[in-house]
């Protein structure tokens, strides 16, 4: 039986009120076509999980069952086309997930700067779609931060190298590790903010290449080696943009990808589709995860097919969305990416839109954002 079939059967039991019963956690009830343990075993195989003692196994099994139930609730509540279910994080509590993969809660005060909206933004039309992934050699491959809480550094590095490739027509892959080792607050893998990354680049007069200064994560003590390697990219400044989504879309289409910081709560259970959350299910004020905004689009109207967690079909309305690049590897979400509804500040996507300023000394043909 496939994993999908296993989950489907288990969730039938779950919805019938039997999913979390003791009979699924023990063998006292006699043989069943499917037990929670069997589903959990497949999860362990798929994501290479093992637990050091029976008590820990039982605890993780209970968390896994709770998370599948939570994913089912999210599936029913979401107003978009998102599908929720089993992910690499399904054996973690919500608190553990936040501690392992989020950053510190972003402060209300940011570096002393003025929000910038170009004067020619207002009144100009925004293209219907924009996807920088389709432009040749602009967006790098999806990285995996692992157990290092460095989403802020990876998002900023992705922003800088994408803009450098657009402005200079030069392929560069900049060092995330340099940002971790040389960050002004010395937090390294313990979290940070994207503006810390930009200030580090300015203080060090640029960044070395990923090849010269490779990512090590939390596998070694952080020792700044910024002066040891040649700089391959640098910035003139960085800017916090307006929180107007129309202005953000225009800036993104004209200039290139930008960093945003969101509430990552729903990403623990996310598989694919457009997340259209409510403020109660994803508080836009509590942002804790930085990612790269690479494009936007609009889903066509139609019928959404049933999912593993919900076999019922529902009307799919035309939904505008953002395309975001994550740092949890290409096997998560939509090949390392995810989509958020565009137009209502879903999960706080407009709270901290930041971008580097990378200017080219030579006038070259502009690379436009592919539709």
UniProtKB/Swiss-Prot annotation:
SUPFAM superfamilies found in the cross-reference section: Cysteine proteinases (SSF54001)
Gene3D superfamilies, sorted: Cysteine proteinases
UniProt-listed InterPro entries: Papain-like_cys_pep_sf, Pept_asp_AS, Pept_his_AS, Peptidase_C1A, Peptidase_C1A_C, Peptidase_C1A_papain-like, Prot_inhib_I29
Endpoints of the signal sequence: 1-21
UniProt-listed CDD domains: Peptidase_C1A
Subcellular location: Endoplasmic reticulum
GO CC annotations, alphabetized: endoplasmic reticulum
Pfam families: Inhibitor_I29 (PF08246), Peptidase_C1 (PF00112)
GO molecular function annotation: cysteine-type peptidase activity
This protein's UniProt keywords: Disulfide bond, Endoplasmic reticulum, Glycoprotein, Hydrolase, Protease, Signal, Thiol protease, Zymogen
Residue numbers annotated as active site: 151, 289, 326
GO biological process, one term: proteolysis
Sugar-bearing residue positions: 48, 112, 203, 344
EC number, as in UniProt: 3.4.22.-
Proregion span(s): 22-125
Enzyme class: hydrolase
Keyword Glycoprotein: yes
Cystine connections: 148-189, 182-224, 282-347
Family according to the record: Belongs to the peptidase C1 family.
Biological role: May have a specific function in the mechanism or regulation of T-cell cytolytic activity.
Protein name: Cathepsin W
Species for this entry: Mus musculus (Mouse)
Lineage: Eukaryota, Metazoa, Chordata, Craniata, Vertebrata
């Amino acid at each position: 039986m496939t994993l999908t079939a296993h989950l489907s059967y288990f969730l039938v039991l779950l919805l019938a009120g039997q999913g979390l019963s003791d009979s699924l956690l023990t063998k006292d009830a006699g043989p069943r076509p499917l037990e929670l343990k069997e589903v959990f075993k497949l999860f362990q195989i798929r994501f290479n999980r093992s637990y050091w003692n029976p008590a820990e196994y039982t605890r993780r099994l209970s968390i896994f069952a709770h998370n599948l139930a939570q994913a089912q609730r999210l599936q029913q509540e979401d107003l978009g086309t998102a599908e929720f279910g089993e992910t690499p994080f399904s054996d973690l509590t919500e608190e553990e997930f936040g501690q392992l993969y989020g950053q510190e809660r972003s402060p209300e005060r940011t570096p002393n700067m003025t929000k910038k909206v170009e004067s020619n933004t207002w009144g100009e039309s925004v293209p219907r779609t924009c996807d920088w992934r389709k432009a040749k050699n602009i967006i790098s491959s999806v990285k995996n931060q692992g157990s290092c809480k460095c989403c802020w550094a990876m998002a900023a590095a992705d922003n800088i190298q994408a803009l450098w490739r657009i402005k200079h027509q030069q392929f560069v892959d900049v060092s995330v590790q340099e940002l971790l080792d040389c960050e002004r607050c010395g937090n390294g893998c313990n979290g940070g903010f994207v503006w810390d990354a930009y200030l580090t680049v300015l203080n060090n007069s640029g960044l070395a290449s990923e090849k010269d200064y490779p990512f090590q994560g939390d596998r070694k003590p952080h020792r700044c080696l910024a002066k040891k390697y040649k700089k391959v990219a640098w910035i003139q400044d960085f800017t916090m943009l307006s929180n107007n989504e129309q202005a953000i879309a225009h800036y993104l289409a004209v200039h290139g990808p930008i960093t945003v910081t969101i509430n990552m709560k729903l990403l623990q259970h996310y598989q694919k589709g457009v997340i259209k959350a409510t403020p109660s299910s994803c508080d836009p004020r509590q942002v804790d995860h930085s990612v790269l905004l690479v494009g936007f689009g609009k889903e066509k109207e139609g019928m959404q097919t049933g999912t593993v967690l919900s076999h019922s079909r529902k009307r799919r309305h035309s939904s505008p969305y953002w395309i975001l690049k994550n740092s949890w590897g290409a096997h998560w979400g939509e090949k390392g990416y995810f989509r958020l509804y565009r137009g209502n500040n879903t999960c706080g996507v407009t709270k901290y839109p930041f971008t580097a300023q990378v200017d080219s000394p030579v006038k070259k043909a502009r690379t436009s954002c592919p539709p």
